[in-house]
């Protein structure tokens, strides 16, 4: 792997050197370089430096320009603009040579690995045992999966944790019913995901009906909770059946979502049972938690309720039971002390923000989250229906995730079939899954995670606008051009002058690495999605204005094929980081 310095970084280094040469006391000053509509880049840092040194900004800018060599391999021209801005134009040769180095690097496209890589534990995709996954589970899974891929690509080590809901009082009801009705759940290995969920739903509804009408059964169910929590083998065996059958279902849904879930990363609430008493004991001994009305709680002066009373975090209830806080705090101890995490990232509903704020502060007070560990709650918004309210079925029920994905694939099949020229029905169905699932993911990921968004399948599978289908068709179009080129191979020709559309495309291709790093560092997959949409848009402009196979000279044909090839590889790599497929033909 040979990392490639981006053009923006190279220009930044040149400007920093010129600033230091002009004003030695300004060593280390930031030129504040950014992309510009007036030139390739604009530097605004001279204004702050002029103010600091009490110099005239335009005169200082002119001095800096005099220190910059233009017409060389990198910078073609520099102009002073406005009150003291620098407008910088990069040489065509530099753009092509830089992109050629990226293409030669293979899959990483010249993007370096971060030097200060740590270990991030990503807590995402947390369904509940014995319950169907619904539209509310979509965002945690899709966002978490994309963030892991992006962090991995930068060089960070990531460990996934699926904190599934596999513990609680509801299992007393379920297990007692199964104990009294043996054989209701088939062995997990004998069924598929749909059958597993059907069985679990049947048992849940039947047990709930008995629980709500039979007081004696209700009492037996409560005793079963005690048996479960005390580790009774017979009870645990039946509980394990529910967990195993639920996993079969989970895997089927995640497979449909085109996500890899590793069994060893499914670590539910139950995994922390043994550690929760110690967590409570340590918090009480340290004085972080105190007894209040029989419960063990943590108070926060700055967090108050409507009556201006402190809102407590309940670690242990008055009856001795443990809640979510004890489980989450025990998980933090495990992830920091045993997994050696330097960052804890939670991809959870924004409505849990207060809970995690209190959990993190408690862990800080206890010393379990030291200065060397960062904990971040990336709360996400709600998926809305067309009416702007939380997405429901027409009957007012929560939308099943499987139904939503199936409909997306079905709608995508209509789009693919309409555009298909030489695809068989099997190929259409294969592409439909890639397009439909990609459309659902992209609609989510192209939205800032903390914002709500409307689930609109018509827009999601549209060929126009900011959709994954638009990106996929751009990729497929490039593959078609490369096939039509036959024996003519892509080749970079730095000696050629570039068309304006070629320059715009080339400069954007060069920004792939910095964009991925920024999106990963800010946990902002929507920034990568926006980059890819702009890339496809710039390619469309290039395609319209710059004939590829009918270019004026053989060298120009090769150079434009080279730009096509690198664009396709960048689209493929970027969309893969978002968990979206790029079909070669559509």
Curated annotation (Swiss-Prot):
GO terms for cellular component: cytoplasm. It catalyses: tRNA(Arg) + L-arginine + ATP = L-arginyl-tRNA(Arg) + AMP + diphosphate. Keywords: Aminoacyl-tRNA synthetase, ATP-binding, Cytoplasm, Ligase, Nucleotide-binding, Protein biosynthesis. It is an enzyme of class 6 (ligase). A motif ('HIGH' region) lies at residues 127-137. Its EC number is 6.1.1.19. PROSITE patterns: AA_TRNA_LIGASE_I (PS00178). SMART domains: Arg_tRNA_synt_N, DALR_1. GO terms for molecular function: arginine-tRNA ligase activity; ATP binding. GO terms for biological process: arginyl-tRNA aminoacylation. The keyword Metal-binding does not apply. InterPro entries: aa-tRNA-synth_I_CS, Arg-tRNA-ligase, Arg-tRNA-synth_N, Arg-tRNA-synth_N_sf, ArgRS_core, DALR_anticod-bd, Rossmann-like_a/b/a_fold, tRNAsynth_Ia_anticodon-bd. It is found in: Cytoplasm. SUPFAM superfamilies: Anticodon-binding domain of a subclass of class I aminoacyl-tRNA synthetases, Arginyl-tRNA synthetase (ArgRS), N-terminal 'additional' domain, Nucleotidylyl transferase. Transmembrane segments: none annotated. The keyword Aminoacyl-tRNA synthetase applies. Belongs to the class-I aminoacyl-tRNA synthetase family. PANTHER family: ARGININE--TRNA LIGASE, CYTOPLASMIC, ARGINYL-TRNA SYNTHETASE. Monomer. NCBIfam families: argS. This is Arginine--tRNA ligase.
């Amino acid at each position: 792997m040979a990392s490639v310095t981006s053009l923006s970084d190279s220009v930044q280094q040149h400007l920093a050197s010129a600033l230091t040469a002009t004003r030695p006391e300004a060593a280390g000053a930031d030129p504040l370089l950014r992309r510009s509509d007036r030139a390739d880049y604009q530097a605004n840092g001279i204004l702050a430096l002029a103010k600091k040194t009490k110099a005239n900004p335009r005169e200082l800018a002119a001095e800096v320009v005099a220190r910059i060599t233009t017409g060389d391999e990198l910078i073609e021209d520099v102009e002073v603009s406005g009150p003291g801005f620098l407008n910088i134009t990069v040489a065509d040769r530099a753009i092509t040579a830089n992109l050629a180095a990226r293409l030669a690097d293979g899959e990483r496209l010249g993007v370096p690995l971060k030097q200060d890589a740590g270990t991030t534990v990503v807590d995402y995709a947390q369904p509940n045992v014995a319950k169907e996954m619904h539209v509310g589970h979509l965002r945690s899974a899709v966002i978490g999966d994309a963030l892991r891929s992006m962090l991995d690509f930068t060089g960070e080590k990531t460990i996934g944790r699926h904190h599934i809901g596999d513990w609680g009082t509801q299992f007393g009801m379920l297990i007692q019913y199964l104990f009294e009705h043996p054989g209701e759940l088939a062995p997990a290995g004998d069924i598929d995901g749909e059958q597993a969920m059907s069985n679990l739903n049947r048992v849940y509804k039947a047990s709930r009906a008995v629980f709500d009408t039979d007081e004696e059964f209700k009492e037996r169910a409560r005793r079963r909770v005690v048996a479960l929590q005390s580790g009774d083998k017979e009870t645990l065996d039946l509980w394990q059946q529910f967990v195993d059958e639920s996993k079969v279902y989970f895997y089927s849904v995640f497979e449909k979502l085109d996500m890899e879930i590793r069994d060893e990363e499914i670590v539910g609430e139950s995994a922390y049972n043994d550690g929760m008493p110690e967590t409570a004991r340590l918090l009480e001994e340290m004085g972080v938690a105190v007894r209040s009305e029989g419960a063990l709680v943590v108070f926060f002066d700055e967090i108050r309720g409507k009556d201006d009373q402190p809102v407590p975090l309940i670690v242990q209830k008055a009856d001795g039971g443990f809640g979510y806080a004890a489980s989450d705090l025990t998980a933090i101890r495990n992830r920091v002390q045993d997994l050696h995490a330097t960052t804890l990232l939670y991809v959870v509903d924004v409505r849990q923000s207060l809970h995690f704020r209190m959990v993190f502060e408690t862990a800080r007070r206890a010393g379990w989250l030291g200065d060397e560990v960062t904990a971040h709650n990336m709360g996400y918004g709600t998926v809305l229906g067309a009416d702007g309210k939380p997405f429901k079925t027409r009957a007012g029920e929560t939308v099943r995730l499987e139904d939503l994905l199936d409909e997306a694939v079905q709608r995508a099949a209509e789009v693919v079939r309409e555009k298909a020229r030489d695809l068989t029905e099997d190929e259409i169905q294969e592409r439909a899954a890639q397009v439909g699932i990609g459309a659902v993911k992209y609609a989510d990921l192209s939205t800032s995670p903390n914002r709500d968004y409307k689930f609109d399948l018509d827009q999601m599978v549209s060929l126009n606008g900011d959709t994954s289908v638009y990106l996929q068709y751009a990729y497929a179009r490039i593959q078609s051009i490369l096939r039509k080129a036959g024996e003519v191979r892509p080749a970079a020709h730095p000696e050629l002058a570039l068309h304006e559309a070629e320059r715009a495309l080339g400069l954007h291709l060069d920004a792939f690495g910095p964009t991925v790093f920024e999106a990963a560092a800010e946990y902002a997959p929507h920034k990568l999605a926006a980059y890819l949409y702009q890339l496809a848009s710039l390619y469309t402009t290039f395609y319209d204005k710059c004939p590829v196979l009918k270019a004026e000279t053989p060298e120009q044909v090769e150079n434009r094929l080279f730009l096509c090839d690198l664009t396709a590889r960048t689209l493929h790599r970027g969309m893969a980081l978002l968990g979206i497929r790029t079909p070669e033909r559509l």
